[in-house]
Amino acid sequence: MSFFNAYYSEDFEDKLFVEEIIKRWNQGDNEFYIYTSGTTGKPKQITLTRKLLKWSATSTHNKLNLTRHKIMCCLPVQKTGGFMQLIRALIWECDIQFFKPSNDPLDSIGEHDFTTISLTPTQFKSSLLKFPEQLNKFRHILIGGAPSSNSSSFNSKLNHPQIWLTYGMTETASHIAMQNLTNNESVLNPLLG
């Protein structure tokens, strides 16, 4: 049994899916099924094992050197990016709040105490233009889904969070390599574990 709290925005549409995954995780299920995004062809169902999910979440936790954390999930929870945020919250035993995915995820949250967020490059660019003060409140921002621009474009606006470019796919249960753009790392580094 994991000790964490899940919260939902009023317009979040996948609460039943989240509750089913939480139930299955707490029952000890060993296999979970999600669909690929379809960016390289027709979406297909992928089986992710509990062992792989634990490795992915634990490797990310170790890479980010996390202590106290609270996740803001604004990605589709039935796809890898959002699904893994749920799995991380279960394994890390931290609070998570789910929001309806949009290109402007920070548009309606106001003041917040979230520490970690995963964004697509489109969401990140929009948030950087419109809500840099809210982005600055995060400790870690993970950007996945496509290549991102170099760090010079945001280093002048963001001085607090560590910004990570990630590389992964559904079949690997999220990212397998990360690059710290805040520290000007020049390459993606594989997660250890």
Regions found by a protein language model. Give the residues of each.
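AMP-binding/adenylate-forming
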Residues: T47-T58, K70-S126
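Gly/Ser/Thr-rich phosphate-binding loop
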Residues: L129-N184
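Conserved S/T- and glycine-rich ATP-binding loop of Class I adenylate-forming
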Residues: T36-T39, I71, L86, I117, ...
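ANL superfamily adenylate-forming
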Residues: M1-R24, I141-L142
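Conserved pre-ATP/AMP-binding loop-to-beta segment of ANL
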Residues: F17-Y35, H69
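Short Gly/Pro-enriched turn/cap motifs at secondary-structure boundaries
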Residues: S186-G193
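Conserved adenylation A10 loop of the ANL superfamily
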Residues: N30-I46, G168-E171
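Glycine-rich helix-loop-beta junction characteristic of Rossmann-like nucleotide cofactor-binding loops
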Residues: H61-L66, F131-E133
